[in-house]
Amino acid sequence: DAPIGQLAGKMGVVIDLITRLPVAIWFKENPKASDINFEPDILNLVQAGTLLLLDRGFYHFKFWQQLIDQEVHLITRIKKGASYKIQRVFTDSYSIRDRLIQMGSGTDKAPFITLRLVEIRSKTIWHSYLTSVVDPLILPPYVVADLYARRWRIEEAFNTVKRLLGLSYLWTGSVNGIKLQLWGTWLFYAVLIDLSDAVADEMTLPFDRISLEMVY
């Protein structure tokens, strides 16, 4: 029997929502490291006016407040059973609930933070989102939901890099070798995205209609 493989580390990637290209790539040697280890990297990367779509690995009030202090905004999903206080109701209808809330306990790790809780009804299910953009005129409820749905593009990017381009399997166990394969694979991914975009333009089709696998 072949020996059981070992996890080589953990990578963090920021993807541009429009271009689908990686903005930054980080590697941590500890495969069990928490996502919060990438928070300093993100804080150093983002510029004022940026809107981040965050998964629940970055569900951290102190980090959110640090982003807001840098004039960077976010959209994420609220955790089930999360505690909050309603400060203002913008909309409360059959299909939309949009409220200004306060979360946190006032401690260093969980400071008080003011956010919008946007809830969109789909048949009998409510989908709940948090955003630091507190003005509904700037970011209406349905735009919040639509933008967060596009966060799935990061999952698609990881799937392409790991499965189609082979990053699930490493050539070497050395850290330098792993990093070389990591950067090389993402570089190839960027070329594939750029080429697929050119194919979409040539065929006058939306990018989503183009098969990256067929282009590859």
Segments from the language model and where they lie:
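Single, function-defining residue in the core of a domain
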Residues: 2-216
